[in-house]
């Protein structure tokens, strides 16, 4: 929209802030994710398990992975519900929403050159259309948008799985696990590709920007 002028570094700072905020929220989940329910056995009482099983299991996991794990504060809660994973998924969904917004901004900026904004040129990663010579499709932002839609869908499934616990048991753990791991992998890989193949390599069309009517808004008399 032809409104007020804004610099490209200001646009990029907004994207940076969105992503950094999401990273901070995800990192806050790490201490909660480090508490494991192993040793609670079927319903959290620890029946038929050695009294030190949970503690020893966490020590072994810490040694194997290099991350510090601890026994759950409450096995009954952690076996019957998956609130921590639901919360993590919510933060991943928010990250996906932010990334989709960035991808859509790139698509709009790249639109044109005649019937669109034409403010930037994305790197041509593959041939465009055989019937429209010179057309460059924003394939990375488009792929990013699809991934983000999938992560948002995964979050919906995880939410349903989390609320499906009955008393001290939740039989939807395999589905929850599949979707949270999928969301983590999809977002991690896509964030790198979006950064390397779209954001780092786009070229600003200065001539096109200088023709924008919005540049005349700032010096206009009040």
Where are these regions (language model features)?
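Long, amphipathic alpha-helical stalk/connector segments used for oligomerization, subunit docking
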Residues: 150-212
């Amino acid at each position: 929209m032809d409104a007020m002028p804004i610099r490209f570094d200001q646009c990029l700072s907004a994207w940076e802030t969105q992503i950094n905020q999401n990273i901070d929220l995800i990192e806050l989940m790490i201490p909660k994710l480090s508490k494991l329910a192993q040793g609670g056995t079927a319903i959290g009482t620890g029946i038929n398990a050695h009294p030190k099983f949970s503690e020893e299991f966490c020590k072994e996991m810490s040694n194997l992975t290099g991350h510090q794990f601890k026994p759950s504060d409450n096995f009954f809660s952690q076996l019957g519900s998956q609130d921590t994973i639901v919360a993590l998924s919510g933060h991943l969904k928010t990250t996906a929403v932010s990334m989709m917004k960035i991808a859509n901004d790139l698509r709009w900026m790249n639109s044109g050159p005649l019937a669109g904004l034409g403010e930037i040129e994305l790197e041509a990663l593959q041939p465009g259309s055989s019937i429209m010579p010179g057309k460059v499709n924003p394939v990375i932002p488009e792929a990013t948008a699809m991934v983000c839609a999938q992560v948002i869908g995964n979050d919906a499934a995880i939410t349903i799985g989390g609320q499906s616990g009955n008393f001290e048991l939740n039989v939807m753990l395999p589905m929850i696990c599949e979707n949270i791991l999928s969301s983590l992998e999809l977002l991690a890989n896509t964030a790198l590709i979006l950064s390397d193949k779209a954001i780092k390599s786009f070229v600003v069309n200065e001539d096109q920007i200088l023709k924008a009517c919005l540049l005349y808004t700032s010096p206009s008399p009040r």
